[in-house]
């Protein structure tokens, strides 16, 4: 369960969030496999997460990285922070994220911190409630980031100017 594993490949920042060993009991004993949860981002608003399973740890991590690259979304950031405060949930995990002023840094824990770092968010206040299962926390964080829209995109959808919205 390392959160510090970070590589730069093709302009993407890759982080390993979790490695888990699981066992399947069969007639002859136990079969051990490994699952990996990774997040990938470009540091400019594009971010993705993936899960991989294999009998070997490196193969599971590689599969997770490939899945994360296929599962990328674009996040509308307001400079180095979020557009507005938001709540999101997945399963029993609930996350709350709010924009922070310049120089605050990423105040978030565990899996949520990894997602926000690779997405390019540099100033944010975040809290996780309920279950802290890394898989569900990453899902909840992604739901929140995916739902976030910039005022410009909302104005364009409504056919108004940004000043008319506020």
UniProtKB/Swiss-Prot annotation:
Highest taxon above the source species: Bacteria
Every S5 DRBM domain range: 12-75
Swiss-Prot/TrEMBL GO biological process terms: translation
Pfam family for this entry, one: Ribosomal_S5_C
Cross-referenced InterPro entries: Ribosomal_Su5_D2-typ_SF, Ribosomal_uS5, Ribosomal_uS5_bac-type, Ribosomal_uS5_C, Ribosomal_uS5_N, Ribosomal_uS5_N_CS, Ribsml_uS5_D2-typ_fold_subgr
GO cellular component terms, A-Z: small ribosomal subunit
Gene Ontology molecular-function annotations: rRNA binding; structural constituent of ribosome
Keywords recorded for this protein, A-Z: Ribonucleoprotein, Ribosomal protein, RNA-binding, rRNA-binding
Keyword DNA damage included in the entry's annotation: no
Classification via Gene3D superfamilies: 3.30.160.20, 3.30.230.10
Function comment: With S4 and S12 plays an important role in translational accuracy.
Record comment regarding domains: The N-terminal domain interacts with the head of the 30S subunit; the C-terminal domain interacts with the body and contacts protein S4. The interaction surface between S4 and S5 is involved in control of translational fidelity.
The protein's assembly and partners: Part of the 30S ribosomal subunit. Contacts proteins S4 and S8.
Family: Belongs to the universal ribosomal protein uS5 family.
Record-given protein name: Small ribosomal subunit protein uS5
